[in-house]
Regions:
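Absolute protein N-terminus
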Residues: 1-2, 88
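Short acidic active-site motifs
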Residues: 37-41, 78
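Glycine/Thr-rich phosphate-binding loops of Rossmann-like dinucleotide-binding domains
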Residues: 59-60, 77
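Ser/Thr/Gly-rich flexible loops in soluble cytosolic domains mediating phosphotransfer, phosphorylation
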Residues: 66-88
């Protein structure tokens, strides 16, 4: 499974999100290839899932990947809830 964590510039915030997603997936016992990028580059990628904010998700409407919305990239409980709801 490939997961792409997306923020506006693809550096700071998406890196934090990627680290938190990797930690939550590890706790859940799920293996995945998790990467981070900016919203423009994400349009050309084809992962299984894209995790991003509600605002940036609007820029990815029509994308072939399943979009998972996370509003607080630092909140591992929110990330876990979103992953459980979408990966099940």
């Amino acid at each position: 499974m490939k997961i792409l964590c997306v923020c506006g510039l693809g550096q700071g915030t998406s890196l934090i999100l990627r680290i938190n997603v990797e930690n939550v997936l590890r706790e859940m016992g799920i293996e995945a290839d998790v990467e981070n990028t900016d919203v423009s580059s994400a349009s050309a990628e084809h992962p299984d899932y894209i995790i991003t904010s509600n605002e940036l998700a609007q820029s990815l409407e029509g994308h072939s990947s399943k979009i998972i919305i996370v509003n607080n990239y630092f909140d591992t409980n929110e990330i876990k809830t979103a992953l459980e709801a979408n990966l099940a």
